[in-house]
Amino acid sequence: MFQDNPLLAQLKQQLHSQTPRAEGVVKATEKGFGFLEVDAQKSYFIPPPQMKKVMHGDRIVAVIHTEKERESAEPEELIEPFLTRFVGKVQGKNDRLSIVPDHPLLKDAIPCRAARGVQHEFKEGDWAVAEMRRHPLKGDRSFYADLTQYITFADDHFVPWWVTLARHNLEKEAPNGVATEMLDEGLERQDLTALNFVTIDSASTEDMDDALYAEELADGRLQLTVAIADPTAWIAEGSKLDNAAKIRAFTNYLPGFNIPMLPRELSDDLCSLRANEVRPALACRMIIAADGTIDDDIAFFAATIESKAKLAYDNVSDWLENNGTWQPDNEGIAQQIRLLHRICLSRSEWRHHHALVFKDRPDYRFVLGEKGEVLDIVAEPRRIANRIVEESMIAANLCAARVLRDKLGFGIYNVHTGFDPANADALAALLKTHGLHVDAEEVLTLEGFCKLRRELDAQPSGFLDSRIRRFQSFAEISTEPGPHFGLGLEAYATWTSPIRKYGDMINHRLLKAVIKGEAIARPQEDITQQMAERRRLNRMAERDVGDWLYARFLNDKAGTNTRFAAEIIDVSRGGMRVRLVDNGAIAFIPAPFLHAVRDELVCSQENGTVQIKGETVYKVTDVIDVTIAEVRMETRSIIARPAA
């Protein structure tokens, strides 16, 4: 009788349209209930029974109920699931399997089975890649997943690496393929094998990209020749190896090992500028004045070189600082180090006055045992030899940026536009409260940005610098020449690491076209997107493996009185994040560890400060002593507390 009643349908429609609804993202808690976060200000309570229909991170539409003045959300429609493809640990065996996603806020096991075509017999503790197949908000009774790939067994010592690479869908090994002979590119190669080129790298480096040679001209100016490994002499555009490199976009450097962009035979041998081996190279010759200015007469050319020495950063630095026992093999090499040192000092001086110089931060190196255990974490400060190479590379990349811009009008450029124009007024207002007066328009120019950065660098602490970081835009990869505000340069195009960066290989091909006077097509925009995405994934992978290894390394310090110096890097409502100065580990200090009485405590992300009873007690960039309260291995998180 009621089945096709149009009035009833209309009434239903009316009720539906009158019921309040909200769209937002589900936030789970460890207590079973959750919240629907609509925006920064508004959230609705989701009771535990309703949480069974959703997962942390799902974007949903929910019906809003009001009972006794309390609002709650009932999930109704799934807009975007949080989990699609994920990694996790398998529970159970054979016919009754489930998988717990490897995520700090996802604790529930999801029933699953091996997907068709997956041969592995899964058992308790195995790590796997899974894909969600069912969701309660899609009309299914429950969540369900397919196991699409076996990663490794529970006790594999290398779980951090294999699980992380699988999570981000990144390659586990070097690409296959060989390059048997050099291509005929129609390039005249200058024979520079007699010159004293040297490479300076870490002692363990095998993929040497760059060799340097300096000489003093009769008028006292210095001439620098930067010779760069030449993989495009072996790899044709559009070939199988080229396409594999294009997908990888970068060599992936993880703690303990790397996954190269090119086959190891090329990256570590045929292309690597090994000592006493003749190698093809792409070279740039520039003349540097006493004040560090690079002459306009820049020459790019193809060459053949033979590195005369594989030098290590620490040895060269020790020698220049009159420390240690290491000596250059002969006077020719010693003379090179002295000249390169002079170039470094004059270029550094020029950049201090006319561009910007990053503050030196140490690199942290994990020392690993045979079984992936962390034996030590060593802070490696950036020393004078690192700076020699850095100044030479920045100069060479500046030269490439100019030549590609002037001769072609395009290339693969690293572009950074400083501050987002939408933030300029807020930035000026913030600086004003700290006694720095800037013009909101001027600060958007390269000149104005550099001026502000120099003023910030002259401040007694980095606190103000940390406050304005959120107003900055991100660096981008672009085919269009543009300024790099972060470096304080009018344009910047890298070509000095073609063994490990695909964008540098593209710039090599463009520079070769310039050398030959040939026309060449502008690179496609999609390649810059692929490079940006891969750079993001590689960084996340490096961070994830690092978190795992830090947790392993500090696990035995939990609950002890061992003190660590730690720099405060961020303040949030829930507490503050710190970086341990000696090893680079990131730890979290929950607000209750800062002060027991919550009402007397104000943690302000906006101001980067922690106030107790109205007094600022901690602020971002402060260095404090902490102890490790707890290490949660399942989430790889380190909880610290201020040392008593």
UniProtKB/Swiss-Prot annotation:
Pfam families referenced in this protein's UniProt entry, alphabetically: OB_RNB, RNB, S1
Matches recorded under NCBIfam families: 3_prime_RNase, PRK05054.1, RNase_B
Function (record text): Involved in mRNA degradation. Hydrolyzes single-stranded polyribonucleotides processively in the 3' to 5' direction.
Keyword vocabulary terms for this entry: Cytoplasm, Exonuclease, Hydrolase, Nuclease, RNA-binding
Stretches assigned to the S1 motif domain: 561-643
Hydrolase as UniProt keyword: yes
Superkingdom, natural source: Bacteria
UniProt source species: Salmonella schwarzengrund (strain CVM19633)
Protein name: Exoribonuclease 2
Family: Belongs to the RNR ribonuclease family. RNase II subfamily.
Catalysed reactions, semicolon-separated: Exonucleolytic cleavage in the 3'- to 5'-direction to yield nucleoside 5'-phosphates
Lineage of origin: Bacteria, Pseudomonadati, Pseudomonadota, Gammaproteobacteria, Enterobacterales
